[in-house]
């Protein structure tokens, strides 16, 4: 009988990665970030444990989408009150809270349970080029989300 490998939690080494979202495609970038957060590219990956790394996303205000999504993609939220549904386009949300766009895309690609919530806390998104995590010495994560472009 094959058993799932259980890595010791204290032996796991968590890396810090930094991603520049300037002109990157939203969905492709989010799927790469979700893979790193889950730890799927590590040898010690275990489906029910948090084996992933930390990811810092900078320049979230400069993320790109293709086609007419800038004006047609809608983000919805509800206040919990009757008639409390609020709808906002991608362009308006990008002006108001650009971090939420990346967070929303990545959160949708993580498990919908307590493990997903734990993984989501390891994502740090910032609208501008600065971040307060210099002490962690993050490595640059090369992500090519533009089809046909050289990385």
From Swiss-Prot:
The gene is rplM. The keyword Ribonucleoprotein applies. Keywords: Ribonucleoprotein, Ribosomal protein. One of its GO terms (cellular component) is cytosolic large ribosomal subunit. Belongs to the universal ribosomal protein uL13 family. It holds the Pfam family Ribosomal_L13. This protein is one of the early assembly proteins of the 50S ribosomal subunit, although it is not seen to bind rRNA by itself. It is important during the early stages of 50S assembly. This is Large ribosomal subunit protein uL13. One of its GO terms (molecular function) is mRNA binding. Part of the 50S ribosomal subunit. One of its GO terms (biological process) is negative regulation of translation. InterPro entries: Ribosomal_uL13 (IPR005822), Ribosomal_uL13_bac-type (IPR005823), Ribosomal_uL13_CS (IPR023563), Ribosomal_uL13_sf (IPR036899).
């Amino acid at each position: 009988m094959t058993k799932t490998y259980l890595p010791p939690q204290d032996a796991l080494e968590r890396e810090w990665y930094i991603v520049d979202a300037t002109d990157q495609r939203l969905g492709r970038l989010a799927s790469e970030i979700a893979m790193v957060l889950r730890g799927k590219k590590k040898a010690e990956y275990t489906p029910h444990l948090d084996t992933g790394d930390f990811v810092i996303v900078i320049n979230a205000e400069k993320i790109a989408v293709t086609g007419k999504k800038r004006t047609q993609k809608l983000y919805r939220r509800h206040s919990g009150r009757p008639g409390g549904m609020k709808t906002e386009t991608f362009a308006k949300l990008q002006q108001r809270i650009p971090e939420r766009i990346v967070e929303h895309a990545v959160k949708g690609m993580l498990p919908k349970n307590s493990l997903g919530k734990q993984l989501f806390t390891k994502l740090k998104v910032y609208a501008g080029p600065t971040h307060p995590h210099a002490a962690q010495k993050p490595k640059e994560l090369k992500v090519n989300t533009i089809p046909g472009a050289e990385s």
